[in-house]
UniProtKB/Swiss-Prot annotation:
The lineage of its organism: Bacteria, Pseudomonadati, Pseudomonadota, Betaproteobacteria, Burkholderiales. One of its GO terms (cellular component) is plasma membrane. This is Nickel and cobalt resistance protein CnrY. Keywords: Cell inner membrane, Cell membrane, Cobalt, Membrane, Nickel, Plasmid, Transmembrane, Transmembrane helix. Residues 69-95 are periplasmic. Induction: By nickel and cobalt. Its main location: membrane. It is found in: Cell inner membrane. The chain crosses the membrane at residues 46-68. One of its GO terms (molecular function) is molecular function inhibitor activity.
Length: 95
């Protein structure tokens, strides 16, 4: 236990020597200028909610687009016919 007491005495001495020329008010001003932990957590939660909403909107848009494409896409036969006489391509096809 004597080693612990020695260590604590030495630590107190080193701490007191290191803090002699420290300007405590400037440190407190720097700490008070930083946002509180609650503010940081709220910002992170808001950013996460915005990202989740954007991703959900993107997925919903893709799903609705897919459903609309399937519903509106009606297969129609493609007929191959000769071009009309008024078409310039009609001159290329001989009779």
């Amino acid at each position: 236990m004597a080693d612990v007491e020695e260590w604590l005495t030495h630590a107190r001495k080193v701490t007191q020597e290191a803090s002699i020329g420290v300007d405590v008010t400037s440190i407190q001003e720097c700490i008070s200028a930083e946002p509180a932990q609650r503010v940081l957590v709220a910002r992170r939660d808001a950013w996460r909610a915005i990202c989740c909403a954007a991703f959900a909107a993107l997925v919903a848009f893709a799903a609705i687009n897919r459903v609309a494409t399937i519903m509106l896409e009606k297969p129609a036969p493609t007929w191959v016919a000769t071009p009309s006489a008024a078409s310039p391509f009609g001159l290329l096809i001989g009779k």
